[in-house]
A protein has these predicted regions:
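Primarily recognizes the serine-hydrolase "nucleophile elbow" in alpha/beta-hydrolase
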Residues: 76, 136-216
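Alpha/beta-hydrolase fold active-site loops
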Residues: 64-67, 162, 196, 220
């Protein structure tokens, strides 16, 4: 039996433990200034999307180049969001890249294509076959990318003909479908009417069987994937790129030995893997150089 004198100590210890658990279960603090939340229409004509705008940091042009960012199957938010889905709970990876582009003088917008459709928490890898058609990365999400493109062109701080695209995992698959010259989301796309170029990080390259004979993008596309990817097939991507390049597609693939899925996630669980850290450094440098060339005036 505890004495009356020891009760305050017990209560203090319990309160401290609860505080520690609460902090541990909360998303990490923001990596920089919070992005602005905006809304805009998907090019599907029926979905009102949410976007998070990272504005250029430091000296920049009156009208800046821009990057549209497409999240993966887990959605744009931290796994620790705990029901709060806003700018304060964006995943570290999306924050990192948003601020990276802002530091390069670009405006970046992260598109939330899942939350407005009722799935803000995203999906697990295991449940791929059960995902609803409303978030199909090949037939639906490209319309979201072009909705973001149209929105950016209404802003007076964006260079309307200097906009690029980046996606991760499921969003990288959506990026590939978006960049196809045969995309249903934009008639007769060109680098002027569409995107100037695109980056696809560890996409699933099966693409619902829609591009079995190759993918012909209307602007340059660069893919990045690791040999130790646990979720998607590097071989599928290699086959897709080989078939596409045989038809003179401007599509290239960088394969990182030993790198996993999500290799660029800044969390310790990924960056403590040496192959991931090396792949991240190389991919960031390649991405910066690629967009510098693609988005120059």
């Amino acid at each position: 039996m505890h004495s009356t004198r020891s009760l305050p100590l017990i209560r203090f210890a319990a309160a401290t433990a609860l505080t520690v658990l609460s902090v541990a279960a909360s998303p990490p603090p923001p990596l920089g200034p919070l992005p602005d939340r905006v809304t805009f229409a998907s090019a599907d004509g029926q979905t009102n999307l949410v976007g998070y705008v990272f504005k250029p940091e430091g000296p920049h042009a009156t009208r800046s180049p821009a990057v549209v960012m497409m999240h993966g199957r887990a959605g744009p938010y931290s796994s620790l969001a705990n029901g709060r889905y806003d700018a304060t709970t964006l995943s570290q990876r999306h924050q990192k890249w948003g601020h990276l582009w802002a530091q390069q003088g670009y405006l970046a917008i992260l598109v939330d294509g899942f939350g407005p459709r009722g799935f803000p928490e995203g999906f697990t890898h295991q449940g791929y076959s059960q995902r609803p058609e409303s978030v199909n990365e090949v037939t639906v999400r490209p319309f979201d990318a072009y909705g973001a493109l149209a929105y950016l062109r209404t802003r007076n701080d964006v260079a309307p003909d200097r906009i690029a695209l980046q996606g991760w995992s499921n969003g990288a698959s959506a990026t590939l479908a978006t960049m196809s010259a045969a995309t249903p989301a934009l008639k007769s796309p060109t680098p002027t009417t569409g995107f100037r170029g695109a980056l696809a990080f560890y996409p699933g390259c099966g693409l619902k069987g829609k591009f079995k004979t190759g993918l012909l993008p209307y602007a340059p596309v660069r893919l990045f994937i690791g040999t130790a990817d646990e979720e998607v097939s590097p071989q599928d991507c290699s086959d897709l790129v080989d078939m596409s390049r045989a038809q003179r597609a401007d599509l290239t693939l960088k394969i990182y030995p030993g790198a996993t899925h999500d290799f660029d996630d800044p969390g310790a669980s990924r960056q403590d893997i040496p192959a991931n850290a090396a792949a991240t450094r190389d991919a960031i440098a390649a991405a910066i150089a690629f967009f510098a060339a693609a988005l120059r005036s």
